[in-house]
A protein has these predicted regions:
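Phosphate-centric recognition/catalysis
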Residues: 1, 5-24, 40
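General beta-strand structural signal in soluble alpha/beta enzymes
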Residues: 9, 18, 24, 46, ...
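Short, basic and Ser/Thr-rich N-terminal targeting/leader segments
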Residues: 10, 28-30, 138
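Conserved mixed alpha/beta catalytic, RNA-binding, or beta-rich assembly cores of soluble enzyme
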Residues: 24-81
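Acidic, glycine-rich active-site loops and adjacent beta-strand->loop/helix elements
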Residues: 50-55, 94-98, 135-137
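Short glycine-rich phosphate-binding loop at a beta-alpha junction
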Residues: 86-94
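Phosphate/ribose-phosphate-bearing ligand recognition and processing surfaces
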Residues: 97-111
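Divalent-metal-activated hydrolytic enzyme cores
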Residues: 107-160
């Protein structure tokens, strides 16, 4: 399938779809791509979140920018399409540390914090995390297939 036939999810964005839709997001560095799926209805959602916590910012109107509010919004849109909350499962990718930092300053460890926030929100919503490809120091591009629930991760700059 070529990129023109896929639904593109931008940075700080989310999209929902259903079979046979394919959702894709490019350039996940410290950001996290959160794919949520209902295997019975084949309703899917993909979030490209940039930051862990919307409560730390005054201007937080873009819910998709943050892990906490983005996952809530993604699930809400999927339920409106007919997904069942009890069947939802998730797969995640991203959360890299793209630049070498010799510090213990948590503020600079955005990738790790994003992954932790995503996992916490999924757990809070009782959405089972099936798989993850997170961390390290390379980017990722993902494709999420609504027909099968397959989450294809393409690594960018991954050491061999």
């Amino acid at each position: 399938m070529n990129l023109d036939e896929m639904t593109k999810v931008g940075m700080a964005d989310l999209k929902v779809g259903k079979s046979p839709d394919v959702l894709t997001t490019l350039g996940l560095g410290s950001c996290v791509g959160v794919a949520i799926y209902d295997p019975v209805t084949k309703i899917s959602g993909l979030l490209h979140c940039m930051l862990p916590d919307s409560t730390q910012f005054r201007n937080n109107s873009n819910k998709a920018k943050y892990a906490d509010s983005g996952i809530d919004e993604l699930v809400a849109q999927m339920l409106k399409l007919g997904a069942s909350k009890v069947r939802l499962v998730a797969k995640i990718a991203g959360g890299a540390q793209m630049f070498a930092m010799n510090t213990n300053n948590d503020t600079l460890r955005v990738g790790e914090r994003n992954v932790a926030a995503v996992k916490m929100k999924l757990s809070e919503l009782n959405i089972r995390l099936l798989s993850e490809d997170c961390g390290l120091n390379y980017g990722r591009t993902v494709e999420f297939y609504s027909e099968t629930g397959e989450y294809v991760i393409k690594s960018v700059g991954k050491p061999r």
